[in-house]
C-alpha cells in the first residue's frame, strides 16, 4: 500500500528530471525532483503552523499547481485534505465546514476573494503566500516531521458527492483505496511507465475522477499533469495541439464544447491517443463525432465518488454495455430486499457494489445514518438501475430516483433522453415526470436546440425508435440551457421547479414547444 505522497516520491526517484506539472497559462514547469522539494517545503510550513496528523483541513480551489502541492503536502503530513468544490456558494461551504467539524482551512494569496469563506467562527484560516509555495520553509527548528506510514483504513482524503438531493455528503477515502483507484484509471487511460504521457486537467481535482484518474494517475506514471483552471474550449484545443496532449479525460459536456468551438479541427488533436469520458451518459451524436474526428478507442467509465470506477467499456463506439472493473464486484438486487441476493440475468434492479473492495470508501463524514442507508449487508447501493444481459454485460437504465410513473407504467428518464438526443438539432435533453390528474405523471421532455425544431419532429424520432408508446413525451419544452448544480450535473429538482412555474403556459402553435429562459447555472 502506498500513499498519494509515496506514489509521487517513487516517480521522483525513477525520473527526477521528467516534467511533473506544467501550467499552460504561464508555461511554468516543475520536474519531479522540484515537485518533491516543494511538497516537503510546504509540509514543513503547515506543520510549523500547527497542522497535525489526522486533522481535517479544507481547501476549495481550482486546478492549479499550488492546489496540487498543498494537497500532497497535507497527505505527506498525514493530515486529511477535505476537498470542497470551489463552485459552491459561500453559505454552502460554511454549512459543510460547520457540519463536518472542520477546524482549519487553507487559502492562497492568489485566490483573492475566491476559495473557502473567510472569518468562520471557530475555524483557523491558513493563508499561504507565493513565496511559501515556491520555497517552503527550511530553518533550524522547523524540520519536516518524519513520515509515518498510515494504516490501510486510516482516512486519506474527503471528497464530496454532487449533492443533487441536498447538501453534499463527505465521502471518506482510506489510504488502502489510493493505489487501486489510480491503477485502474491509469491503465484505462493507456498510461504506461516509460511512455510519454501528457494529461490535460479538464476534470477538477475536487472530483475523484480528476484527482485519482487524471492528476494522481499522471504523476504515478511519470506523466505530466497540465491543470486547466477555467475551461475555455477554444483555448483547450490550442493547448492540446501546442503541448502534445496524449490523453483527454473529460465529461461529455467538455467534449461537446470542444467539438463545437470554431477552433476545433481534427488535425489539432493528432497527438491524442486516448479518450475517456465519465461523469454522465454521453449523447450518441457526440460519441459519433468523437469517433469520426479522433479515430482512437473511446473508453466509457462508470463510477461513483464512493466506489470509484466500478464499470467500464474499453471501446464505447463498438460495444454495448459495461464490464465490471478490475477492483470491483457488482450485481443487481431488488430495491426492497437485501442487496446480497443477486437478481438473475435480464431482470432489472438496483446496481450494488461490493463494499469490501479495496477502492471503496469507508463511510460518510459525521453521517452514520447515511452510511447505514448506503452500505447494507456488505454492499453499496448506488441508486442506479439496470440489468445484466445474456452476454454478461451490464446495461444501465437510469437513476431509480428519476423513474417516472405514468399510468402505472415505469419509464426511465435516461432511456427517453437517449432517444430524443438522436435528432442532430438536439444539443441536450432532460426528461422528467410532471404531476397529472389522469396519468399520475406525464412524461415531459426539455431540450436545448442548435437550430429551429418542432415538437412533432421529436415525437417522430420517438415513433421511429424502439421506444414503447407509453414512454413518449407528451409535453415538450425548449430552454436556453439546462440547470446544473455545482458539480455540473443536471439538476432535475430545479428543472421541475421551472416547469411547475410554466405548467399552465400554452405551446407555440407553430413549433409545439413551450419556451422559457433558465437563469444562468451556478
Swiss-Prot record:
ATP binds at residues 161-169, 300-305, 410. Gene3D superfamilies: 3.30.300.30, 3.40.50.980, Luciferase, Domain 3. One of its GO terms (molecular function) is ATP binding. Its EC number is 6.2.1.33. Pathway: Xenobiotic degradation; 4-chlorobenzoate degradation; 4-hydroxybenzoate from 4-chlorobenzoate: step 2/3. It is an enzyme of class 6 (ligase). It comes from the Bacteria. Keywords: ATP-binding, Ligase, Nucleotide-binding. Its cofactor is Mg(2+). It catalyses: 4-chlorobenzoate + ATP + CoA = 4-chlorobenzoyl-CoA + AMP + diphosphate. Optimum temperature is 25 degrees Celsius. CDD domains: CBAL. InterPro entries: AMP-bd_C (IPR025110), AMP-bd_C_sf (IPR045851), AMP-binding_CS (IPR020845), AMP-dep_synth/lig_dom (IPR000873). One of its GO terms (biological process) is fatty acid metabolic process. SUPFAM superfamilies: Acetyl-CoA synthetase-like. Optimum pH is 7.0. Pfam families: AMP-binding, AMP-binding_C. Belongs to the ATP-dependent AMP-binding enzyme family. Catalyzes the formation of chlorobenzoyl-CoA via a 2 step reaction. First 4-chlorobenzoate is adenylated by ATP, followed by acyl transfer from the 4-chlorobenzoyl-AMP intermediate to CoA. Benzoate, 4-bromobenzoate, 4-iodobenzoate and 4-fluorobenzoate also act as substrates. Inactive towards 4-nitrobenzoate. Homodimer. This is 4-chlorobenzoate--CoA ligase. The lineage of its organism: Bacteria, Bacillati, Actinomycetota, Actinomycetes, Micrococcales. The gene is fcbA1.
Amino acid at each position: 500500500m502506498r500513499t498519494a505522497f509515496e506514489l509521487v516520491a517513487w516517480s521522483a526517484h525513477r525520473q527526477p528530471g521528467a516534467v511533473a506539472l506544467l501550467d499552460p497559462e504561464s508555461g511554468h514547469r516543475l520536474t519531479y525532483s522540484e515537485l518533491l522539494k516543494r511538497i516537503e517545503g510546504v509540509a514543513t510550513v503547515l506543520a510549523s503552523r500547527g497542522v497535525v496528523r489526522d486533522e481535517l483541513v479544507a481547501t476549495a480551489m481550482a486546478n492549479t499547481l499550488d492546489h496540487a502541492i498543498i494537497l500532497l503536502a497535507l497527505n505527506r503530513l498525514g493530515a486529511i485534505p477535505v476537498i470542497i468544490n470551489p463552485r459552491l456558494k459561500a453559505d454552502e461551504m460554511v454549512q459543510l465546514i460547520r457540519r463536518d467539524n472542520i477546524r482549519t482551512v487553507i487559502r492562497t494569496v492568489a485566490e483573492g476573494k475566491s476559495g473557502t469563506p473567510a472569518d468562520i467562527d471557530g475555524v483557523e484560516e491558513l493563508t499561504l503566500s507565493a513565496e511559501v509555495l515556491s520555497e517552503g520553509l527550511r530553518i533550524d527548528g522547523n524540520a519536516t516531521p518524519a513520515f509515518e506510514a498510515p494504516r490501510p483504513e486510516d482516512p486519506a482524503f474527503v471528497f464530496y458527492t454532487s449533492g443533487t438531493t441536498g447538501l453534499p455528503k463527505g465521502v471518506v477515502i482510506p489510504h488502502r483505496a489510493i493505489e487501486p483507484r489510480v491503477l485502474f484509471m491509469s491503465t484505462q487511460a493507456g498510461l504506461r511507465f516509460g511512455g510519454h504521457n501528457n494529461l490535460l486537467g479538464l476534470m477538477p481535482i475536487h472530483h475523484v475522477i480528476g484527482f485519482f484518474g487524471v492528476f494522481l494517475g499522471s504523476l504515478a506514471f511519470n506523466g505530466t499533469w497540465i491543470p486547466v483552471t477555467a475551461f475555455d474550449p477554444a483555448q483547450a484545443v490550442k493547448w492540446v495541439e501546442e503541448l502534445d496532449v496524449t490523453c483527454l479525460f473529460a465529461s461529455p459536456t467538455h467534449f461537446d464544447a470542444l467539438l463545437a468551438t470554431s477552433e476545433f479541427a481534427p488535425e489539432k488533436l493528432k497527438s491524442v491517443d486516448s479518450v475517456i469520458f465519465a461523469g454522465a451518459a454521453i449523447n450518441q451524436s457526440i460519441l459519433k463525432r468523437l469517433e469520426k474526428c479522433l479515430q482512437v478507442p473511446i473508453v466509457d467509465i462508470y463510477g461513483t465518488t464512493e466506489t470509484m470506477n466500478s464499470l467500464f467499456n474499453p471501446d464505447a463506439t463498438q460495444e454495448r454495455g459495461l464490464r465490471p472493473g478490475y477492483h470491483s464486484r457488482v450485481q443487481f438486487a431488488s430495491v426492497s430486499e437485501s442487496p446480497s441476493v443477486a437478481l438473475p440475468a435480464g431482470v432489472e434492479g438496483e446496481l450494488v457494489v461490493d463494499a469490501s473492495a479495496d477502492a471503496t470508501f469507508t463511510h460518510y463524514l459525521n453521517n452514520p445514518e447515511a452510511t447505514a442507508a448506503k452500505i447494507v449487508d456488505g454492499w453499496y447501493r448506488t441508486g442506479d438501475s439496470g440489468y445484466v444481459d445474456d452476454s454478461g454485460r451490464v446495461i444501465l437504465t437510469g437513476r431509480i430516483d428519476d423513474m417516472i410513473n405514468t399510468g402505472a407504467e415505469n419509464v426511465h428518464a435516461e432511456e427517453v433522453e437517449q432517444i430524443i438526443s438522436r435528432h442532430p438539432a438536439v444539443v441536450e435533453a432532460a426528461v422528467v415526470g410532471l404531476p397529472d390528474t389522469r396519468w399520475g405523471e406525464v412524461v415531459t421532455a426539455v431540450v436545448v436546440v442548435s437550430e429551429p425544431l418542432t415538437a412533432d419532429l421529436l415525437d417522430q424520432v420517438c415513433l421511429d425508435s424502439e421506444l414503447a408508446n407509453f414512454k413518449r413525451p407528451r409535453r415538450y419544452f425548449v430552454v436556453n440551457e439546462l440547470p446544473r448544480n455545482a458539480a455540473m450535473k443536471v439538476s432535475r429538482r430545479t428543472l421541475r421547479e421551472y416547469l411547475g412555474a410554466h405548467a399552465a403556459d400554452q405551446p407555440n402553435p407553430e413549433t409545439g414547444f413551450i419556451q422559457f429562459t433558465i437563469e444562468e447555472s451556478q
